[in-house]
Amino acid sequence: VAAERGHRVEIVEALQVVGGQFRLAGMQPRRGQILELLDWYERQFDRPGVRLRLNTFLEDQEVAEHAAQVVVVATGSLPDDTGFQRWVPQEATLPGIEAGGVWSPEAVLRREARLGDAVVVYDEGGNWRGVGTAWALAEQGKK
């Protein structure tokens, strides 16, 4: 919208792709339309007046030195490699996590995790990340 109104827009993304948690959601079964929406957004970045910088972290000093009239900060988050998010206050760590073999939903859905045939999905938050990951694993024939 800002570019359509004649403003120069610069979007800075720390990762190599845009989408963050939406991309994870789109990797889950029956959610491919989310990835299609992200692809549409990426095509919008090709419009005149919009510059997209991927793989770029900005420090506060760089933001302060930028000649922008308006800065919108949408920081997102980075998941823990194990996927443990500590939703339950009394669990500072996941018991047994140091033994290894614990993977984040992101690693599972990107097929980076080396899993056996039997898998336990621990969803301490009770949200879409755990359910969607369990669904994807079931579709892969995991028990």
Place the predicted regions along the sequence by residue.
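Rossmann-like dinucleotide/flavin-binding elements
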Residues: 1-15, 53-65, 74-143
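Short, Asp-centered acidic motifs that coordinate Mg2+ and/or phosphate
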Residues: 70
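N-terminal Rossmann-like dinucleotide/flavin-binding domain of flavoprotein oxidoreductases
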Residues: 20-65
